[in-house]
Regions:
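All-alpha prenyltransferase/terpene-synthase fold signal
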Residues: 1-145
Length: 145
């Protein structure tokens, strides 16, 4: 037994869920960064045929023509089509996501989850343990790799 109340366990579960969302959203954003900035390959999700929140929201906001074109480019990239240049395709997708504010939207969603995670901890007294959890949360959001 942890000695925690149901309310405390629920709060920690909520904190963990929102922390996980922040981590995943940051991972999605980093995938659209430049390799030089993060020191590892980028655009992995797109190349694997996975649509992340920045792409999904950009597709939703885009004109029908732009969305259809980017879907074709992303599909060709994922299928390793010999008819496209992978670097140019990646740059086109990145530009599309920036044009339709997909990255900014993901950052706004991270901030919503950050606030909810901190709110979940509000039932606990201020101490080094709570501070450590908040530090972990901030790291998940502010990491550059």
């Amino acid at each position: 037994s942890t000695g925690a109340t149901m309310r405390q366990m629920t709060a920690m579960r909520q904190f963990g869920m929102h922390l996980g969302m922040c981590f995943q959203l940051k991972d999605d954003v980093l995938d659209y960064s430049d390799v030089e900035d993060i020191g590892k390959p980028t655009m992995n999700d797109i190349r694997d045929g996975k649509a992340t929140l920045p792409l999904l929201i950009s597709l939703k906001r885009a004109t029908k023509e732009d969305a259809e074109h980017i879907r074709e480019v992303a599909e060709a990239l994922a299928n390793k089509s010999p008819h496209i240049d992978p670097f140019e395709a990646e740059q086109e997708i990145k530009s599309f996501i920036l044009r339709y504010d997909g990255i900014r939207y993901a950052h706004q969603e991270m901030e919503k989850h950050r606030k909810k995670a901190i709110a979940a901890l509000s039932i606990f007294p201020d101490n080094k343990y709570k501070e450590s959890l908040i530090t972990l949360l901030n790291y998940a959001i502010n990491r550059v790799k």
